UniProtKB/Swiss-Prot annotation:
One of its GO terms (cellular component) is extracellular region. Residues 1-106 are annotated as: CH1. It comes from Oryctolagus cuniculus. Glycans are attached at N46, N114, N212, N261, N277, N284, N445. SUPFAM superfamilies: Immunoglobulin. Disulfide bonds join C28-C90, C137-C200, C249-C308, C356-C418. CDD domains: IgC1_CH2_Mu (cd16093), IgC1_CH3_IgAGD_CH4_IgAEM (cd05768). This is Ig mu chain C region secreted form. It comes from the Eukaryota. Keywords: Disulfide bond, Glycoprotein, Immunoglobulin domain, Secreted.
């Protein structure tokens, strides 16, 4: 009897629009195999197995002198809408050979993105030394969810200072499932005032959607696209140092603020104490506002969801946005290196620059602080770059921080410590210390000074 390996075909549901209440049926057809014994299993793209409780395998059917069989898996549509998976893997074991087949999630409809870029108000630039602010690019209403966002300055791609959030499913009633994504670019005030042209480039299914802005855009008479809401997640530095998580809900393009209300609530609907702050009017005659609330760091780290609700007389219904700590980003701890001042700089007897290089970490949220003789230094004593993607390691980031001290302090043997905080580190924080006598960095136990600022959250 000759053996015949199975040929695999994908099967997808022909039902209507995806909603959070539906199960998406996906299947795998194996045909023309011999002998008749065959085994199906399913996994996600990241190789994690799918529970057999959601898998149904139908009896083998004889077709001519060979056999065929099918397997079905039911996946909650919210996983399809909100997850990062693009396909499932159907795995078929047969005595003649094992075969794998990618079964792509169904695309409810193909819709292009609506791209908007929000420019910074003139009074939003802040910081000691180099003053900075952010451009925000938002793409909404698109499907399918696969999309990428990049930034250009005067036609050249910008690599540093970019923070792009994961794609989110848009919450709405009946109709096709659509998605949104936002990306932020940190810019300096000098670059903005120099009339540099910034471009947010959105790539969706091989088609580019470009939106250009510059300082002259502030004087544009283009009408407002309507009230926009941007929930901003707390940074790791905030949650680690204060033991509380600060939730920010940014509302832009307000024509009036008298009827505005911003509120935060936990996943069970319990209202959180929300402080609302109204900015001054912008050059395009609109306002911005922020609603801030604080929750325990433990609640945020556990993945609990929090919802910002915005009401205003210009809105036909309240706008709601829900955020939670992302669980889909792979965690990788940073490697930390401290470099002493260059000999050529010390010869000048003017100043000494100590550099802290932080490499290979994920997610991108990290903080760097400096200490002298174990005491924290003020942030105006050092400059830390925004995390940037590692050129040779996709998914990982690097940053560097430079501390400038007097040549006298360095030559007198003062110790300088780079303290790095990241959620993937065993104790959330690590440090490296260097001084003139060693000439090389030394690893010490984590200082307790930083924890003195932490408060207990009840």
């Amino acid at each position: 009897v000759s053996l015949s390996s199975p040929t695999l075909y994908p099967l997808v549901s022909c039902e209507g629009a995806l909603t959070d209440g539906n199960l998406v049926a996906m299947g795998c057809l194996a045909r023309d195999f011999l002998p008749s014994s065959v085994t199906f299993s399913w996994s996600f793209k990241n190789n994690s197995e799918i529970s057999s409780r959601t898998v149904r395998t139908f009896p083998v059917v004889k077709r001519g002198d060979k056999y065929m069989a099918t397997s079905q898996v039911l996946v909650p549509s919210k996983d399809v809408l909100q997850g990062t998976e693009e396909y499932l893997v159907c795995k078929v074991q047969h005595s003649n050979s094992n075969r794998d087949l990618r079964v792509s999630f169904p695309v409810d409809s193909e819709l292009p993105p609506n791209v908007s870029v929000f420019i910074p108000p003139r009074d939003s630039f802040s910081g000691s030394g180099t003053r900075k602010s952010r451009l925000i690019c938002q793409a909404t209403g698109f499907s399918p969810k696969q999309i990428s966002v990049s930034w250009l300055r005067d036609g050249q791609k910008v690599e540093s200072g970019v923070l792009t959030k994961p794609v989110e499913a848009e919450t709405k009633g009946a109709g096709p499932a659509t998605f949104s994504i936002s990306s932020m670019l940190t810019i300096t005030e000098s670059d903005w005032l120099s009339q540099s042209l910034y471009t947010c480039r959105v790539d969706h299914r091989g088609i580019f959607f470009d939106k250009n802005v510059s300082m002259s855009s502030e004087c544009s008479t283009t009408p407002s696209p309507g009230i926009q809401v941007f929930p901003i997640a707390p940074s790791f530095a905030d949650t680690f140092l204060s033991k509380s998580a600060r939730l920010i809900c940014l509302v832009t393009d307000l024509t009036t603020y008298g009827s505005l209300n911003i509120s935060w609530a936990s996943h069970n609907g319990k209202a959180l104490d929300t402080h609302m702050n109204i900015t001054e009017s912008h050059p395009n005659a609109t306002f911005s506002a922020m609603g801030e609330a604080s929750v325990c760091a433990e609640d945020w780290e556990s993945g609990e969801q929090f919802t910002c609700t915005v009401t205003h007389a210009d809105l036909p219904f309240p706008l709601k946005h829900t955020i939670s700590k992302s669980r889909e980003v792979a965690k990788h701890p940073p490697a930390v290196y401290v470099l002493p001042p260059a000999r050529e700089q010390l010869v000048l007897r003017e100043s000494a620059t100590v550099t802290c290089l932080v490499k290979g970490f994920s997610p991108a949220d990290v903080f760097v602080q400096w200490q002298q003789r174990g005491q924290p230094l003020s942030s105006d004593k050092y400059v830390t770059s925004a995390p940037a993607p590692e050129p040779q390691a996709p998914g990982l980031y690097f940053t560097h921080s430079t501390l400038t001290v007097t040549e006298e302090d360095w030559n007198s043997g003062e110790t300088f410590t780079c303290v790095v905080g990241h959620e993937a580190l065993p104790h959330m924080v690590t440090e490296r210390t260097v001084d003139k006598s060693t000439g090389k960095p030394t690893l010490y136990n984590v200082s307790l000074i930083m924890s003195d600022t932490a408060s207990t959250c009840y």
